[in-house]
Amino acid sequence: MMSDKVFKTLHARFQIPDNIPIYLLGKFEKCYTGKTADVGMYNAMFAARLRLPLTTLHRQLANFLRLFVNQITPNAWRIFIGDEILWGRLNGGNHQITLDEFFWCYHPQHIVSSQGIYHFSARKKELRLVSDMPDCNRNWKGRYFFIKGMNWVCR
């Protein structure tokens, strides 16, 4: 669980707008999905460049996969956001990647050792736009917080 010192820096460090309330969980609470109206978020998701409020495309991704945003690994967010940026640059900023285009290159894959958690695997090596990934952070689920309300959903 994150300390209060870390909690106080979340808004500034991860550029979370002040109108999106965040809080730490109690001593025995876990960052599960679907057990509360509020949404659990992992610190590592923001280190992978996920930002709030979510873009419409990020929300569409979670809805299409029928997942909560915290069921997508930080490296999967890194792949999706990296592809989103590269796709826009390769198209002169005139075309945003669509889910169909993304899923032509990648497919969601369940992580066997982590129930309900998914990542993206390239369908072919040459279709992998984001190839430089940090080492696997097996402790990424240990630092989390909750977001209240609905202001985080879409910008």
Kindly label every feature range from the protein language model.
Residues 1-155:
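Residue-register detector that marks a fixed positional context within folded domains
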